[in-house]
Design a protein with these regions (language model features):
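C-terminal accessory "lid"/substrate-recognition subdomains
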Residues: 2, 42, 141-142, 147-373, ...
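His/Asp/Glu-rich metal/cofactor-coordinating catalytic motifs and the adjacent surface-exposed loops
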Residues: 379
């Protein structure tokens, strides 16, 4: 039996995912499509729009509604079971899953990439994840990426000047977010853009040609491998989103612009066209630690033209752990992720260095594997100025021999030493 191709639609609230889904259903040209729709509202307006707006019965399109939560969180098991049921029942050529506007795409992709031993379900044997589509609202992306709003704080009230469709506005008003969800809108947008192989810039009629050109270059810097398609009302040739055979989990996991920059040491392809619009990136790399207080102060006053920064940071006050810096627009987070090999026992170091040539090749006689390396992506970046500001946050010559644990610490993390 041929594996059924699966397309996943992601995108923030109001971007046009439901419009795209309706477009797919209305132009299916004989394709037998099973649709899995999920939103986080008590009244599934997305579902009603698909069923009624598309003029299609649930029987015809095998519309499946998972109404108890997000498909990539609380309903992961239901999604597995529902997809298995649909495929085994037969009579379909394609599955399309519309994620809720507050969903991250990676967990959905993982559902189709691994065997679930607990449930005894192996979706990899009966279907294949074919295309990960992310829809971006051209008119709101820049505003939302620079917003400091958390998902749970975003006001869903309707503004008379809001140019989104009535359908999208209704969806937005009815989507609900868990009160404990502390994700920012900027973080979610970046997650959705960085993990896709088709990126649809929708509502291009609401911005100027110059704004569109710049937005396209920003998105290309964030996700350099995805195919970018510009649309009005999410109208796209279905061959670009169905049965494209584009998706590869390993490649998708490594396709984000910040990863490409780090892998190339800051020498990824920077096209003249991109630089014409002021879009650039560079890698900051040092073998000295940051003074945590000074670095934190810099993060809090980071220029707003820095769109994305991500990578590993070495903080003097936490000399035994590597920290992950992840910044998206106005949202910034830093936290410990793993122990430096240099902080482990001599026996552990010997074993790891024997097994990991990449670690051994970068080993410093004094500091071991400790280092800072992160990428900065933005518009009209002054690399020299930013580099000087960051260098000023490093432990200086007068501090290098001091007791780093006595430095002012803004984080106050409680972390046990490596064993």
């Amino acid at each position: 039996m041929a594996k059924i191709p699966v397309t996943v639609l992601s995108g923030y609230l109001g971007s046009g995912k439901t419009t795209l889904l309706n477009h797919i259903l209305q132009n299916r040209e004989g394709r037998r499509i099973a649709v899995i729709v999920n939103d986080m509202s008590e009244v599934n307006i997305d579902k009603d729009l698909v069923a009624d707006g598309g003029g299609l019965s649930r029987t015809d399109e095998k519309l499946v509604e998972l109404s108890n939560g997000c498909i990539c969180c609380t309903l992961r098991d239901d999604l597995l079971k529902e997809v298995e049921r649909l495929v085994k029942k037969g009579g379909i050529d394609q599955i399309v899953i519309e994620s809720t506007g507050i969903s991250e795409p990676v967990p959905v992709a993982q559902t189709f990439s691994y065997i679930d031993d607990e449930l005894g379900i192996d979706l990899t044997a009966i279907c294949r994840l074919d295309t990960m589509v992310t829809v971006v609202d051209a008119n709101r992306f820049v505003h939302d990426i620079n917003s400091e709003d958390l998902l749970m704080d975003r006001d869903q009230s309707v503004d008379e000047t809001d140019e989104r469709s009535i359908a999208d506005l209704l969806i937005d008003r009815d989507q609900s977010v868990d009160e404990t969800d502390e994700r920012s809108i900027a973080d979610l947008l970046i997650d959705q853009v960085e993990f896709c192989d088709v990126l649809i810039i929708n509502k291009i009629d609401l911005i100027s040609e110059e704004e569109l050109a710049k937005l396209e270059k920003v998105l290309s810097a964030l996700q350099p491998t995805a195919k970018i398609i510009k649309t009005i009302n999410s109208e796209v040739d279905l061959k670009e989103v169905l049965n494209t055979q584009r998706f590869d989990f390993e490649k998708a996991s490594e396709s984000a612009g910040w990863i490409k920059e780090l892998e190339s040491g800051g020498h990824a392809s920077h096209t003249p066209e991109t630089e014409e619009y002021g879009i650039s990136s560079f890698v900051y790399k040092r073998r000295l630690p940051f003074h945590a207080k000074r670095f934190n102060d810099w993060l809090e006053t980071m220029p707003n033209n820095v769109v994305r920064s991500k990578g590993i940071v070495w903080l003097a006050q936490y000399n035994h752990v590597a920290c992950l810096l992840s910044q998206a627009g106005s949202s910034c987070n830093i936290h410990p992720v793993t122990y430096w090999v240099a902080s482990m026992s001599e026996a552990q170091q010997t074993q790891i260095l024997a097994e990991r040539q990449d670690v051994a090749a970068e080993w410093d006689p004094e500091y071991g594997d400790r280092h800072t390396q992160f990428v900065i992506i933005g518009t009209d970046l002054d690399e020299e100025k930013l580099t000087k500001e960051l260098d000023a946050c490093l432990v200086n010559a007068q501090e290098i021999d001091a007791d780093w644990q006595q430095f002012e610490d803004p984080y106050q993390w409680q972390i046990r030493p490596a064993r």
